[in-house]
Regions:
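Short cationic amphipathic helices and targeting signals
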Residues: 32-34, 103-113, 183-188, 261-266, ...
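Short amphipathic beta-strand and strand-loop transition segments with alternating hydrophobic
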Residues: 92-101, 248-254, 315-322
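Helix-loop elements that line ligand-binding/catalytic pockets
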Residues: 244-273
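A conserved glycine-rich beta-strand in the N-terminal activation segment of trypsin-fold
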Residues: 167-242
Length: 362
């Protein structure tokens, strides 16, 4: 849990319109690709309301998770070591993964964020962080670098994911952090990082969002995040072939005062798409009955409050769209109402956490 919190903190970023998603450096053969861009001016993250919401959430979470109290200290430690402001609305990421037949993942992440390369190098050297090599580019061992930034991140580094190694295969390379310039960092195993770095230098063709997917992405208003899945680049399976699944695109965007999400799945034919559309619409139709619960079983006030929040979330889900070989789920929530719903969920969780028996002190 601590590792996930810390990694989320380190990679916190938001996004720009779809035409400004920067995929340069992302290998075109990745099965799953994602990107974000600057959040500057977005109500969801770069507004007085968003900042006030974030402050309230940090205070609430700190009351139930002691390690959360150190988030500001971690941010300051990272800024002192790298010059990077994790809360800058101009931070962006792009990357992706490919999956092997045995289920092993390979991929990388490009972080586009202003930082001080000299300061980062001096810090890594002073902390004696191990080095790795991606072609002609030197980098640092990612786990060791993370551990060197702060005591809390050092604890998280113990849970750092180790690259999987197939039985009988040579030991896998560690994940490295490669600093290309004051605006670009690459996180990947050395061999993959070398490939990404070459693409960033213009040596080869990077991934490009398919033109057929742009209407779905742009339909969210001002898109600020996108994830694309290409089934043809996933390991083949009889189940996937029979389903006719070709791929999917997920996008989040801001349209006026609303947050809009679209998730579209594509199939080889209208007939192959129909089962998913029917199942999804059926689940939505059953939602009110599921929320009503069993009248013979009394609900606590907390449970009633949570069901009301879930009802508000579901109310933002639009009817399933089935058009030809495409099935689309659209959600729309008013931004301030969304903040309120999330705040209520956290508050209920905090109340339950405080009421739960505490582990005995050792």
């Amino acid at each position: 849990m601590r590792l996930l919190s810390c990694l989320a903190l380190v990679s916190t970023v938001a996004v720009l319109p779809a035409q400004d998603f920067d995929f340069k450096g992302v290998p075109a053969d990745y099965a799953i690709v994602f990107a974000t861009a600057s959040s500057r001016g977005l109500k969801i993250s770069d507004s007085p309301e968003a900042k006030a919401f974030k402050a309230r959430m940090e205070k609430t979470i700190a009351g139930i998770e002691p390690s959360a109290k150190n988030s500001k200290e971690m941010q300051e430690a990272i800024k002192a070591a790298t010059g990077m402001d994790l809360e800058s609305p101009d931070n962006r990421i792009a990357g992706g993964v490919t999956l092997g037949a045995a289920g092993q993942l390979n991929g990388g992440v490009i972080i586009r964020a202003r930082h001080d390369s000299k300061k980062l190098s001096a810090h890594a050297s002073a902390k004696k962080v191990g080095t790795v090599q991606a072609g002609a580019t030197k980098g640092w061992n990612g786990q060791e670098l993370l551990a060197s930034l702060s005591d809390e991140l050092a604890k998280a580094a113990k849970d750092f994911p180790a690259p999987a190694t197939a039985a009988g295969a040579p030991a896998s390379e560690p994940i490295g952090v490669f600093d290309l310039d004051d605006n670009t960092l690459v996180i990947a195993q050395p061999k993959e990082a070398a490939r990404i770095i070459d693409l960033l230098k213009g040596k080869g063709a990077s991934y490009a969002l398919n033109a057929s997917l742009r209407p779905q992405v742009n339909a969210t208003g001002r898109p600020y995040a996108v994830v694309s899945v290409n089934a043809a680049k996933l390991p083949p399976s009889a189940e996937m072939t029979n389903s006719g699944f070709q791929g999917a695109v997920f996008a989040m965007g801001e349209n006026g005062s609303n947050q809009v999400m679209k998730l579209s799945a594509f199939f080889t034919s209208k007939e192959k798409a129909a089962p998913l559309a029917q199942q999804a619409q059926g689940m939505l139709a059953m939602a009110p009955m599921m929320l009503a619960g069993d009248p013979s079983k009394p609900q606590s006030e907390e449970d009633k409050a949570m069901m009301a929040i879930v009802g508000d979330f579901i109310a933002g889900i639009q009817p399933i769209e089935a058009k030809g070989n495409q099935v689309t789920l659209t959600t729309k929530w008013e931004t301030l109402k969304l903040f309120g719903m999330l705040e209520k969920v956290i508050a209920i969780g905090a109340t339950k956490a405080k009421a739960a028996p505490q582990p005995a002190a050792k």
